[in-house]
């Protein structure tokens, strides 16, 4: 198969092992952990062109390119990562990873627990926070020899990680890009997450999180959780244009099977998601969202938290995003302006809702490209090999 000229093409994930104990915010300790990572582009001689991509709730390390010749879908942010794209792999060395607690190769609930005869962690996997993720990402940076990132970029939950980076490691990034995110969850967002969790926890096949030991899987609960979540990712206008009140068969069937096209879509999305995602991971990810609040250690003041930062910021929101509305991004911008920090803010008129950050919307992509600029360039020799 021939790939598009602006694609990074075939990519091979790498697994990095960390043997030192990892102390987590919850008080638990992981004796060791692994991170699944993909890289695109070439690291230059002075390690100055590295960009870290932080993923959202259902994301992972496969952000761009293809794993196999016959893959029909590219990585989740392929629209923005590649030769000549906004995150230009001709200029930048891009690193994407699957966070701990995930289910795509990094240590998580499906991984063997060395303290329990290598049975899957399941519900025994500790709850992790955004700060824990950023800590592991910093350890990955050390392993790669990258003392300072040219940029740390993320959308949604990924944007929260980028924000945490700027507070916890202010001297280790030059630019921070926070997209469709928030400085902490609202009560409504926590409520959405709780409904999703309860749909999983109440599934008879959940077995208190030990479904793998029972050769079972809480598929119904995970499908429902994804359906609830997916509604919040779309705008009303997008749903109106895509589905309206269109009927699947053209007429009312007067029953409880699928009748409206939007019902069919939600069931399909839930079904597809349930085939590829772990239920315990979903619980962990939503709790990490709930716990996120960088102001917590700064007298509940986001302004005081952002006073620690030293980098440039790009903050992007989308007009129809009601999960993380533009006002939430403006809270971050206001805190930065109060501290006289360099920040560019863009509110993009887009109809796709919260998921807008995944689409190559022209103004959004153009702004991201311009912000990253051309300051970093590859040195001809030597090139750095990552092991």
Swiss-Prot record:
Active site: 156 (nucleophile), 321, 354
Domain AB hydrolase-1: 49-358
EC number: 2.3.1.46
Record localization: Cytoplasm
Disulfide-linked positions: none
A single Gene Ontology CC term: cytoplasm
BP-aspect Gene Ontology terms: homoserine metabolic process; methionine biosynthetic process
Keyword Amino-acid biosynthesis in record: yes
Main EC class the enzyme belongs to: transferase
Superkingdom, natural source: Bacteria
This protein's pathway: Amino-acid biosynthesis; L-methionine biosynthesis via de novo pathway; O-succinyl-L-homoserine from L-homoserine: step 1/1
Activity regulation (UniProt): Requires MetW for activity.
Keywords tagged on the record: Acyltransferase, Amino-acid biosynthesis, Cytoplasm, Methionine biosynthesis, Transferase
Pfam families hit by this protein: Abhydrolase_1
Catalytic activity entry: L-homoserine + succinyl-CoA = O-succinyl-L-homoserine + CoA
Residues under site feature: Important for acyl-CoA specificity: 323
Transmembrane segments: none
InterPro entries: AB_hydrolase_1 (IPR000073), AB_hydrolase_fold (IPR029058), HAT_MetX-like (IPR008220)
Keyword Ribonucleoprotein part of the UniProt annotation: no
Self-association and partners: Homodimer.
Function (record text): Transfers a succinyl group from succinyl-CoA to L-homoserine, forming succinyl-L-homoserine.
Record-given protein name: Homoserine O-succinyltransferase
Name of encoding gene: metXS
């Amino acid at each position: 198969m021939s790939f598009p000229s602006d694609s990074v093409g075939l990519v091979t994930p790498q697994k990095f092992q960390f043997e030192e104990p990892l102390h987590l915010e919850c008080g638990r300790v992981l004796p060791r952990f692994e991170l699944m990572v993909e890289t695109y582009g070439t690291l230059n001689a002075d390690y100055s062109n590295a960009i870290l991509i932080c993923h959202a709730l259902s994301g992972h390390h496969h952000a761009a390119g293809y794993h196999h010749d016959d893959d029909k879908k590219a990585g989740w942010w392929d629209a923005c990562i590649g030769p000549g794209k906004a995150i230009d792999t001709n200029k930048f060395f891009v690193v994407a990873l699957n966070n701990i607690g995930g289910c795509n190769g990094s240590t998580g609930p499906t991984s063997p627990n060395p303290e329990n005869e290598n049975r899957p962690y399941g519900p025994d996997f500790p709850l992790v926070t955004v700060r824990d993720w950023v800590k592991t990402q910093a350890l990955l940076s050390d392993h790669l020899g990258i003392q300072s990132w040219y940029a740390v970029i993320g959308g949604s939950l990924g944007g929260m990680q980028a924000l945490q980076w700027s507070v916890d490691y202010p001297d280790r990034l030059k630019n921070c890009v926070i997209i469709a995110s928030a400085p902490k969850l609202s009560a409504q967002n926590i409520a959405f997450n709780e409904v999703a969790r309860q749909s999983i926890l109440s599934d008879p096949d959940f077995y208190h999180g030990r479904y793998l030991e029972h050769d079972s899987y809480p598929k119904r609960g995970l499908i429902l959780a994804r359906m609830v979540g997916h509604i919040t990712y779309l705008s009303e206008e997008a749903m109106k244009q895509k589905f309206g009140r269109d009927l699947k068969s053209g007429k009312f069937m007067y029953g409880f099977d699928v009748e409206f096209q939007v019902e069919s879509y939600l069931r399909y999305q839930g079904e597809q998601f349930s085939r590829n995602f772990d239920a315990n991971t979903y619980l962990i990810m939503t709790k990490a969202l709930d716990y996120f609040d960088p102001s917590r250690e700064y007298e509940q003041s986001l302004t005081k938290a952002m006073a620690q930062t030293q980098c440039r910021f790009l903050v992007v929101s989308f007009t129809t995003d009601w999960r993380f509305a533009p006002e939430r991004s403006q809270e971050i911008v206001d805190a930065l302006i109060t501290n006289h920090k360099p920040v560019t803010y863009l509110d993009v008129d887009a109809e796709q809702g919260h998921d807008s950050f995944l689409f190559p919307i022209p103004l959004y992509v153009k702004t991201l490209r311009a912000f990253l600029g051309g300051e970093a360039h590859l040195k001809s020799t030597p090139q750095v090999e990552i092991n």
